[in-house]
Amino acid sequence: MREILHIQGGQCGNQIGSKFWEVVCDEHGIDPTGRYVGTSDLQLERVNVYYNEASCGRFVPRAVLMDLEPGTMDSVRTGPYGQIFRPDNFVFGQSGAGNNWAKGHYTEGAELIDSVLDVVRKEAENCDCLQGFQVCHSLGGGTGSGMGTLLISKIREEYPDRMMLTFSVFPSPKVSDTVVEPYNATLSVHQLVENADECMVLDNEALYDICFRTLKLTTPSFGDLNHLISATMSGVTCCLRFPGQLNSDLRKLAVNLIPFPRLHFFMVGFAPLTSRGSQMYRSLTVPELTQQMWDSKNMMCAADPRHGRYLTASAMFRGKMSTKEVDEQMINVQNKNSSYFVEWIPNNVKSSVCDIAPRGLSMASTFIGNSTSIQEMFRRVSEQFTAMFRRKAFLHWYTGEGMDEMEFTEAESNMNDLVAEYQQYQDATADEEEELYEDEDDADLQE
């Protein structure tokens, strides 16, 4: 049944990924040794989306873990769920990519990629009907961005008709880990535009803000941020893993969210977000969830949806609720805020309802939006890129690994084209669209 193969790369990807497996194991009632300790048959019904059942009745995640240095892998292995993974699926080098995209994509990463692909192939052959791949990585470093995009393009070659979903952590506007982030991110986006089907865009600053403002955590750790991400990741695929009244899968999601093939970078949000202390005092309603999930403060990337318009959006609800109420709320949102939706795509919000809520909540919702305001992120990275590239700063680290300046120029213009496309559809009105069609019709007639 519709399996998803999970791949995590680099330090960031491995940390998010291991948090994600903690959440999914908890939802399916699987303990750190891979044994089922749950109470409900529903947990086992479609457990095989993310797990392989071994002969001894243990469940092994369909996960591939890769990195160019052993450090993060060791901490995953010694972490709470470290023993659940298949030992052969840890693939790591020794040298590290040193935040250098070229090392991850062309030199160090290229040497390791074949052994990663062998593991991916093995896992894919174990699947009954593979639905697609989900990749966790960051775009600012060297391994997740360079080697991550290399792996995505190789998988694309070998499995062209399978969905490719990525959870990509973009460099944040104010929090920077490395100076060369804009280079690494731009080179990665250049690849993701061509080779990924759906990219969920995350960034640390927006996640910090959520922890700080909404969850009232005074000193949020990466663990807290990753917990937010993993709640969203689990929400995106809950329809595949649990029975629901309105199902959605990765492909349905893509068909409903991507009006133009290049514009597949989504904002994600999750509700309810309440600070840990006040959680028990709230009873949730569908209108409350809806209000929170459409709130710009809830978005996990630093772009404000009020500065653009939604091309499409998807709302995934979990818990016991009436679908009628969900539909009413969605229509309500569109009617009240019609200026924030493009008018040339009618009914552009897809909703799905899954019956099983996450642990500790009566209902929850995951939001995925394709908004033109995401161009703010690309624009910001692009400006930083141009500032450095104009001076050819730090370029020798990349050319030294065999890269050509031409590649940088191409990546830069691809990113700028993407921004221009988002802007074009933000400004488009229904009348203009009609004019375009009429022009095309005239052209047909003249032929």
Curated annotation (Swiss-Prot):
Alphabetically sorted, this entry's keywords are: Cytoplasm, Cytoskeleton, GTP-binding, Magnesium, Metal-binding, Microtubule, Nucleotide-binding
Name the coenzymes or cofactors required.
Mg(2+)
Report the main location listed first in the record: cytoplasm
Question: Which residues does UniProt assign to the signal peptide?
Answer: none
Among SUPFAM superfamilies, the record links this protein to: Tubulin C-terminal domain-like, Tubulin nucleotide-binding domain-like
Q: Which Pfam families match?
A: Tubulin, Tubulin_C
An MF annotation (GO) of this entry? metal ion binding
Q: Does the keyword Membrane apply?
A: no
Q: Which Gene3D superfamilies match?
A: Helix hairpin bin, Tubulin/FtsZ, C-terminal domain, Tubulin/FtsZ, GTPase domain
Sites binding Mg(2+) sit at: E69
Q: What quaternary structure, including any partners, is listed in this protein's UniProt entry?
A: Dimer of alpha and beta chains. A typical microtubule is a hollow water-filled tube with an outer diameter of 25 nm and an inner diameter of 15 nM. Alpha-beta heterodimers associate head-to-tail to form protofilaments running lengthwise along the microtubule wall with the beta-tubulin subunit facing the microtubule plus end conferring a structural polarity. Microtubules usually have 13 protofilaments but different protofilament numbers can be found in some organisms and specialized cells.
Q: Its family?
A: Belongs to the tubulin family.
Which named protein is this? Tubulin beta-5 chain
Lineage at the top is: Eukaryota, Viridiplantae, Streptophyta, Embryophyta, Tracheophyta
